[in-house]
Each structure stands twice: as C-alpha cells, then as structure tokens.
Amino acid sequence: MKYADAGVNIAVADEVKQRIRHHANRTFTSGVLGGIGGFGALFALDNKKWKEPVLVSSADGVGTKLKIAMAMGVHSTVGGDLVNHCVNDILVQGASPLFFLDYLAMGKLDPAVIEQLVEGMSRSCRKAGCALIGGETAEMPGFYPPGEYDLAGFIVGVVERKKILTGKAVKPGDALFALPSSGLHTNGYSLARKLVFEVAKLKPDTYVAAVGNKIGAELLKPHFCYAPALKNIVARGWVSALAHITGGGIPGNLPRVLPAGVKAQIDLASWPVPPIFKFLATLGKIETNELLQSFNMGIGMILVVPPAFVKSVEADLKRRREKFFRIGRIERGDAGKPRVAHSGSLNL
C-alpha cells in the first residue's frame, strides 16, 4: 500500500509548491533570506532603520466567509482578506508589517484552488509591503468534506517602542473618526448566511435589488486594508488609539483600546449604513444592539484623535481622498458602566 492509497498525494503536493512559489517570490522584500520550501523562513530586521524595534504578531482567519467563496468558486478574495485582516490588527498598535505565513488545510489538495488563495494573499501582501515567506498546506483525507478547506494567517510586524499605540493616552475630549468598511469584511457571516440562505432561501447568484448586487458577490466584497490610508497619520503620532472593528462590532472592539475612566460616546446617525446591513436587519428583524454586536455596520476602523490633531487628520485623509466620518468623542466614564454609549439611530 502507498501513501496515495490513504488519500495523501505527494506528487500533487509538489505541484502545489511549484504553482505558489512564483506568487510568494513576488512579495519578497530586502529582509527575506532564502526562499519558499525550507524548514523555517528567515527574515533579517534592518538594524539601521530601527532604534528600539518591538515585534508585533497576530493570527486570524476569515470565518465562515469561506463558505461563500467555496459556493461561488472564487477563492482569491478570501486569500487577500486574510492578509488585510492581519495587517489591520497590528496597525492598531502602530506596527508596519514585515512578513506573513499561512495555514491551509483540505481533504484533498486542489492545486487550482490553492493557487487562487495564494495569489490573493500575494496581491494583498505586495500592497501592504509584507513578505509572504512561508506556510503550511495540509492534505487531511477524511477530515474535510470534498471542496472545503480552512484557512488561517499569521503576521509579524515592527514598531518603535516609543511609538507603540497602547490607548493609555486616550483622554476625554478626543474625537472619534471612522473609516468605512466595504461590507461585512470577515465577521458576522454565520448570522448573515443563516438569514440569506436559510431564512430567505436565496442562491449566491440571486440579484437583490435592495443591495444592488448579486448576494454572493456582495458578501464576498474584500476586507479593506487601512495601512496605506493611515501610514502617515500613525507615523506622525496624530492618533492616541486605533480600533479595528471586527468580531463583536464597535461595542466589542473599541473598549479594547480605551483606558479606565473613559467611555466612547457615539452618534449612530453620523455615518451611512451600507445597504447589505439594512437588508440583513430587515430579514432578521434584528434590534440595534444586536446589529452593533454582530456586524461592523459600515465602520472598519476607528481613530481616536486628540483635539490638537483633528485638523491635521482631516486634511491628511482628504488629501488622500479617503472617506471618513466623525462619529463621536471620548468622555469621562464610570466603573461598571458600558464603555461605549450611543445616541441617535442607525440610518436603516
């Protein structure tokens, strides 16, 4: 008996390595030592560029958005989403990405699908200036249903110790700015899929007039990467904190960067809610608090800006033609009370 008889095909694994090597090589920066295929990936930090470098790491996935990609046969988007999500996570602490690794597992290796996924990762890595230096592609027969896979990403970035964003500098009077999301990004898909495919019984290629798009394409919209838009703002020290709005929505993520004694006061009417969220809210008859905890509701990143830098941040974002909204402010908060309060109503 051979390994292939148990469902593991070494020849196909070798083909996969050859197909993805080119996409990884295109991301390599000056810090990369060696290439794809070693037992470990090597990266040399430029000591001349950094005085007191601190490495920042993060790991994440794209959740059940993968189910949408599998149903539509479009995989490069979620590959890119994985990188963008991780880049945004370390950006919150002021870090610039250095390198990225991925973990991909499926029951039977499909070289075409894997190449799509890695091509998407490669594209997002190049845009972020991040090297895709390695990963693991696992063939696990009997573990995943045919055509399904799981995907995770791991990123390492760097920030000067003195420039780490900890949130400790957040004070009452700071302004809250928000950058829009493209849609669900990579969170809330379990609820969205239940509403769309079980409650409404739609197909991925069903056109939804209220959304202005085929529902599958709408749900597969890419997760924005905010690093290019915020690079200068972060470098100049114009923010006291950043919050990436992912699982848990605004109430679940903004408090993670707020020190004790303060709260965020948000005006829910201060930004336009994308049609997809209005559609989902109507389908599920979802109340405001549940919406805010389940979805990003059109907000992908929140900036906490001291009063002295408000005009500078506004001017920088306008110069880059970035959409943004001023959604609230930081106020004094009491222990034991919610860290995020809101007024007004969502534009549903």
What are these language model-derived features?
Residues K2-G7, H22, V113-A131, Y144-L151, ...:
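Glycine-/charge-enriched secondary-structure boundary and capping motifs
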Residues M1-S30:
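N-terminal amphipathic/basic leader segments beginning at the initiator methionine
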Residues P172-N213, A217:
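Acidic, glycine-rich loop-and-beta core segments that form the ion-binding/anion-interacting portion
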Residues H22-S182:
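Glycine-rich phosphate/pyrophosphate-binding loop regions near the starts of catalytic domains
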Residues L66-I68, G188-S190, F325:
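A short, polar/proline- and glycine-enriched secondary-structure boundary/capping micro-motif
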